[in-house]
C-alpha cells in the first residue's frame, strides 16, 4: 500500500484525478472494510488505504502509462508482470527500505520534476500530524498472504524547522506483521532519538 503514494502522483500527472477534483464514486461492491464502502477522494482513499480507488486510477491510466511512470521514477524492481489489478499487492512489484527512502527524498524535494501542485496534493494526502516538533508525513502498508499479515510497512518523513528526517520500517513475520505494528516501532524509535515528541 505504500506504492499508493506514487500511484496517486501518476494519476495526478495524467489528469485522471486533480488536486481540486479527486472524487471517484463507489461502485456499490461490498468490501471487507466499512471505510471502503463509500465514495472517495484522494484524502480519504489514502487515509483508509482504499485499494479499489487506486485500482480505478490505474484502469484509467492504462498499464503502459503506469509502467512508464514506474520506470521514470525508478520504483523498486520495476516489475509489473503480476496481474494488473494487484501487481503492487504482495505480487511482482517489490521495493527495499533503502529504495523507499530514496523515493521519498525525491518526492519531498520534487526532483521528479512533476507539477508542484500534484506533489503538494500527495503530500497533503499523506500528512498525518503536526506538533511543536514539526510535521509528520507517512503511509502504512500491510501485505497479506493466505490470510496472514506477513509484511508490514511504515514509510514517511518528518519536516522540522531545520531538517527533514526520512524513514522506512519494514517487518516480516509469519503473522501480525502489520503497518500498525511498523508504525508503533517507528514512532518509538523517532521518540527515542528526540526527532518526534
Q: Language-model features: where?
A:
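Active-site SXXK
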Residues: 1-23, 45, 167
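Solvent-exposed loop/turn segments at secondary-structure junctions
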Residues: 30-31, 52-53, 75-77, 85-89, ...
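Extracytoplasmic
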Residues: 2-3, 19, 37-40, 52, ...
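Active-site-proximal loop and beta-strand segments within enzyme catalytic domains
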Residues: 13-40
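Soluble non-cytosolic domains of exported or imported proteins
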Residues: 1-2, 18, 36-40, 44, ...
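Mid-domain, small-residue-enriched loop/turn segments at the edges of structured enzyme/sensor domains
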Residues: 34, 41-42, 56-104
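Surface-exposed patches in mature extracellular/periplasmic domains of secreted proteins
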Residues: 19-24, 58, 78-84, 111-119
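Structured C-terminal helix/loop/strand segments within mature extracytoplasmic catalytic/sensor domains
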Residues: 59-62, 105-134, 140-197
